[in-house]
Amino acid sequence: MAARKSKGLTLMEKMIRLETERLILRDYTADDLEQYCRLKMDAKTMYYLQDIQLHSFDEAERDFAAVLSDMASANRRFYFLHMELKRNHEQVGGIGYTVEADTPVGKLVHLGYFTYPAFWGRGYTTEALAAVLR
């Protein structure tokens, strides 16, 4: 899933997009600000991730700007993807990983996901995780 950093590619050409039977997993774009904020501020969705839950639009906006900045970085560390249904583009949640360290055998990453409760128990996260790990 790691973005290839080839010289001469634009940010749009470097953007990650994965598809599964039911989902589209893709890098966030500036147009996703409202959805990102709603997801990261949702108390039920973030119940088990309270350390990264956001509590105001201003806080969410700053966090989202950092996400977009990291995506454009030559040393990208955060690979968190917008997760949406193929059939209607409804946001399911987010999934991805953070590169914690480079080791002799590869990158050490911290994997995470968060989905809206309406999508729990339907296999979406399992499906997305399989695509991310490929």
Q: Positions of the model-derived regions?
A:
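GNAT-family acyltransferases
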Residues: A2-A118, A131
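Glycine-rich acyl-CoA binding loop
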Residues: G121-T126
